[in-house]
Amino acid sequence: MSHQLPDVQASQPDVTVGLSQVGVTGVEKLVKIARDGKRPLVLMAEFEVFVDLPGGRKGIDMSRNMQVIDEVLEAAVSEPAYRVEDMCGDAAERLLAKHEYTTTAEVSMTAELVVREDTPASGLSTQSTAEIIASATATDEGTREEIGAEVVGMTVCPCSQGMSASRARDVLQDLAVDDDTIEEFLDKVPQPGHSQRGHATLTVETQGSPEVDLMDLIDIARDSMSARIYNLAKRPDEDHMTYHAHANAKFVEDCVRSMAELSLEALDHLGDDAVVHMKQSNDESIHQHNAHAEREVTLGQLRDELDA
């Protein structure tokens, strides 16, 4: 005689508190991104998938739910997709439809993207990487999608550089160099300052697909720092990076503000309700701590601030 196993997850919990996110993390899938006239871009992606849980239900049927989640992701990644954020949106909507007790489904994805480029001075072919960030949240009211990336660059501290310039000015004055020549020299030869490896993150979230080019967001994030960095660097390239970084010294706060300004120019086709999340974290070279700044803001509010 067979026995039907009890559905413990559907029972009432001892503490009837609802949960905003229950699901799985670390789900790895191969993702193919279609490209017009080119071979598909294949990414090794890692997903996080969550639904909300009402207070009257003990659990989400984790074992069965994992099968549902796997089926949803497999269906989403097996169909041609041109945008990873749309794929996340499709997965979130499928997940929401399969859970009668949930009101919100969230799917997020990260993956390494290899970018081919040339070194700035020697013109040699090289590669860099960016971490793609994509997510979607589906509710009965619709689906919001997010796309962006985290990139690495170089920053130079303006305060440290200012102290070096002051010392250089004093030495040149002691050598009887006239003030005009000193200022011209300091203007043409940026003085040393302590540098950091910077991590810039930029994402855009809208109702439905953001209709934003991922490579534009990557360029904005890289250009918001003092200088771009490259894996391959001959001596002319090292000189180029070092000079331009010191000629464009920025605090961590400056990087986020540069991201805001560049984003406003590139995203002028989006509505005021689009949300931009900008984040900068710098690995300090002369401290054991790191520097951090960020801002999450609607494009409408950002437009008001920069137009003021």
UniProtKB/Swiss-Prot annotation:
Positions of the UniProt region annotated as Disordered: 282-308
GO BP term (any one) = archaeosine-tRNA biosynthetic process
- What does the Swiss-Prot or TrEMBL cofactor note state? Binds 1 Fe(2+) ion per subunit.
Class in the EC hierarchy, top level? hydrolase
* Gene3D superfamilies, A to Z: Urate Oxidase
Q: Does the keyword Metal-binding apply?
A: yes
**Enzyme Commission number, as recorded:** 3.5.4.39
Biological or metabolic pathway of the protein: Cofactor biosynthesis; 5,6,7,8-tetrahydromethanopterin biosynthesis
Loss of function: phenotype:
Cells lacking this gene are auxotrophic for thymidine (dT) and hypoxanthine. tRNAs of the mutants lack archaeosine (G(+)). A slight growth defect is seen in mutants grown at 45 degrees Celsius in Hv-YPC (yeast-peptone-casamino acids) medium supplemented with dT. Absence of pantothenate from the growth medium of the mutant cells results in a slow-growing phenotype.
Keywords linked to the UniProt accession: Folate biosynthesis, Hydrolase, Iron, Metal-binding
Q: What are the recorded GO MF terms, alphabetically?
A: GTP cyclohydrolase I activity; GTP cyclohydrolase IV activity; iron ion binding
Superkingdom assignment: Archaea
Task: Show which residues form the site (May be catalytically important).
Answer: C157
The cofactors required by this protein are: Fe(2+)
Q: What does this protein do?
A: Converts GTP to 7,8-dihydro-D-neopterin 2',3'-cyclic phosphate, the first intermediate in the biosynthesis of coenzyme methanopterin. Involved in archaeosine (G(+)) and folate biosynthesis.
> Could you say which protein family the record assigns here?
Belongs to the GTP cyclohydrolase IV family.
Any idea what this protein is called? Answer: GTP cyclohydrolase MptA
The lineage is:
Archaea, Methanobacteriati, Methanobacteriota, Stenosarchaea group, Halobacteria
